[in-house]
C-alpha cells in the first residue's frame, strides 16, 4: 500500500531516515496539518486489546490523541448504522466485523482507501485479507444491486481472526478429518469429566459460526453461486445431522446453550478434548496463565477435512475503515498504515493483538509465545471462506441459527429444521430482490 501521498522528495527522504531510527513514522505532522484527536469506534473485548496497547505509542509519536470508544458487539453495529444513516461525523475510524462489509459497502458509507489514499497490496499480508475488505466482493456471488459497481478497498484488517481447530495434543495426534474428530471424541469422551467435543450451540450467531466450517467441508452451503438457497440440499443436510446427532453425542449436556466463553473455559480447565476456536479465545482464556490449567497441552490446526476432501476455515476479521463523513480521513488513513506496519504489528501482537502479517505469524520467537500463530498463518494461506457477502446476512444468520439451535435442542429434526430454514431464507431473499 502507498504510505505517503503528495509529499516532496526531500520530505520522503527525511521520513525514511527517521523510520530507520524509530519504530514508527508520523506523516500527518510532517504534512503540517493534523487533528487534535482521532475517534475510533471499537468492539469491546479481546479484539481491541492490541489496539489499546499501541495507542500510547501512537499518541506520543504523532501528537494526536486516540479516543477509542468501546461498545459490545451488537451495540457497536447498531450505533454505526444509526450514525451513518444520520450522516454524522462522530467517528474518524471504525472497527467492523467482516460480515458487516456487505451492508456498509452496499450503502456506500465508507471511504475507498485505494482510490482516495493510494492504498496498495503488501506482499507480506495475505491476499484474502485485502479481498475481505474489498467491495463488491472479488470472488463468490455478488448481490444483484452491486454487480455494476467498481471494486474498491474499503477496509484493512486489524484483527486477523480465522476460525481454527483446537485439540489436546497430549492425548492424541492432530485429527486430519471430521471423521477422525468424531472417532477421537468417542474414545476420549467421559461424561461429567471430559467432553469429546464442545459444540458451540447457542442460538443465532454462535451455532452458525460453529457450523459453517463443517457445512462447507461436507460440500454444503447456504447459497450456491447464483444465490439459490441450498441449505436443504443433501450435502447440507448431512452436515446438519453430523452436528446435531454425531457431535452432540460427545458434547457436554446443554450444548444448545454453550457459547465461545464456555468452550474455552472447558478447554482451559481440562474438561474438553477438542472444538473449533477463534484466536481471541486462545489469547484470552486457553493460553492465559491466569486461568488455564492446560497451557502447553493444546494444539492448534487449520480446520479438518470433510467428505469434500478439504477443510475450510472461516474468516472473522475485524477491519479498520474510514467513514465517509469523517473530517479527518487523511489522518485516519495514516493511522491504518502505522498500526499495520511491520514494527507496530510486532508490538501489537506482543500485547495480545491478533496480527495478519505473514512475517509476524511465522516468526519463530513469536510462535514460541503464541502457539496458534502457525495454524493461523496456514489457515490464511489456505484462503478461508467468508460468510455470504450479502447485506441480508444478519437476517439469514438469525433464521439459520434459530433453526439449527432448535434441532440441537431436540425441538426439531434435522430434516424439519433445514426445511424450515430454507423456506424462510428463500422468502427473505426474494423480498430483498435476489
List PLM regions with ranges:
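Paired acidic/hydrophobic, glycine-rich loop segments that form the ligand-binding mouth/hinge
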Residues: 92-95, 273-278
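Long, aromatic- and glycine/proline-rich binding clefts that accommodate carbohydrate-like moieties
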Residues: 128, 146, 298-302, 350-402, ...
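Glycine-centered hinge/linker elements that transmit conformational signals in sensory
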Residues: 184-191, 226-257, 299, 303
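Hinge/lid segment of periplasmic solute-binding proteins
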Residues: 98-164, 176, 180-182, 295-301, ...
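Conserved N-terminal structural module of periplasmic/extracytoplasmic solute-binding proteins
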Residues: 2-109, 115, 119-122, 256, ...
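Extracytoplasmic/periplasmic substrate-recognition and gating elements
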Residues: 56, 147, 151, 162, ...
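Extracytoplasmic/periplasmic solute-binding protein
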Residues: 143-159, 163, 180-229, 235-236, ...
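Short, solvent-exposed loop/beta-turn-alpha elements that line the ligand-binding surface or hinge
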Residues: 111-127, 201, 218-238, 287-293, ...
Amino acid at each position: 500500500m502507498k504510505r505517503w501521498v503528495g509529499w516532496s522528495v526531500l520530505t520522503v527522504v527525511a521520513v525514511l531516515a527517521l523510520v530507520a531510527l524509530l519504530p514508527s513514522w508520523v506523516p500527518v505532522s510532517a504534512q503540517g496539518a493534523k487533528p487534535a484527536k482521532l475517534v475510533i469506534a471499537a468492539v469491546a473485548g479481546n479484539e481491541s486489546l492490541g489496539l489499546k496497547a499501541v495507542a500510547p505509542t501512537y499518541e506520543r509519536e504523532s501528537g494526536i490523541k486516540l479516543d477509542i470508544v468501546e461498545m459490545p458487539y451488537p451495540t457497536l453495529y447498531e450505533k454505526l448504522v444509526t450514525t451513518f444513516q444520520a450522516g454524522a461525523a462522530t467517528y474518524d475510524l471504525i472497527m467492523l466485523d467482516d460480515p458487516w462489509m456487505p451492508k456498509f459497502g452496499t450503502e456506500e458509507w465508507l471511504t475507498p482507501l485505494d482510490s482516495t489514499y493510494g492504498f496498495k497490496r503488501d506482499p507480506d499480508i495475505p491476499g484474502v485479507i485485502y479481498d475481505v475488505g474489498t467491495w463488491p466482493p472479488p470472488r463468490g456471488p455478488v448481490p444483484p444491486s452491486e454487480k455494476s459497481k467498481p471494486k474498491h478497498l474499503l477496509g484493512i484488517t486489524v484483527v486477523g481472526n480465522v476460525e481454527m481447530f483446537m485439540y489436546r495434543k497430549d492425548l492424541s495426534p492432530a485429527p486430519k478429518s471430521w471423521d477422525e474428530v468424531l472417532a477421537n471424541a468417542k474414545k476420549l469422551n467421559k461424561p461429567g469429566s471430559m467432553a469429546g467435543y464442545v459444540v458451540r450451540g447457542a442460538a443465532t450467531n454462535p451455532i452458525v459460526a460453529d457450523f459453517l466450517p463443517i457445512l462447507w467441508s461436507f460440500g454444503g452451503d447456504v447459497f450456491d453461486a447464483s444465490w439459490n438457497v441450498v441449505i436443504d440440499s443433501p450435502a447440507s443436510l448431512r452436515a446438519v445431522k453430523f452436528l446435531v446427532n454425531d457431535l452432540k453425542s460427545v458434547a457436554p449436556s446443554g450444548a444448545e446453550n454453550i457459547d465461545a466463553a464456555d468452550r474455552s473455559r472447558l478447554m482451559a480447565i481440562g474438561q474438553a478434548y477438542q472444538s473449533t476456536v477463534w484466536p481471541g479465545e486462545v489469547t484470552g482464556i486457553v493460553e492465559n496463565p491466569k486461568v488455564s490449567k492446560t497451557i502447553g497441552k493444546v494444539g492448534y490446526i487449520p480446520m479438518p477435512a470433510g467428505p469434500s476432501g478439504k477443510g475450510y476455515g472461516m474468516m472473522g476479521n475485524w477491519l479498520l475503515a474510514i467513514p465517509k463523513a469523517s473530517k479527518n480521513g487523511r489522518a485516519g488513513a495514516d493511522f491504518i498504515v502505522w498500526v499495520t506496519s511491520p514494527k507496530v504489528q510486532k508490538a501489537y501482537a506482543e500485547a495480545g493483538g491478533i496480527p495478519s502479517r505473514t512475517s509476524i505469524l511465522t516468526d519463530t520467537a513469536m510462535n514460541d509465545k503464541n502457539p496458534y500463530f502457525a495454524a493461523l498463518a496456514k489457515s490464511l494461506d489456505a484462503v478461508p471462506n467468508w460468510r455470504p457477502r450479502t447485506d441480508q446476512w444478519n437476517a439469514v444468520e438469525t433464521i439459520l441459527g434459530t433453526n439449527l439451535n432448535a434441532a440441537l435442542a431436540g425441538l426439531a429434526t434435522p430434516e424439519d429444521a433445514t426445511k424450515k430454514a430454507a423456506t424462510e431464507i428463500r422468502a427473505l431473499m426474494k423480498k430483498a430482490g435476489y
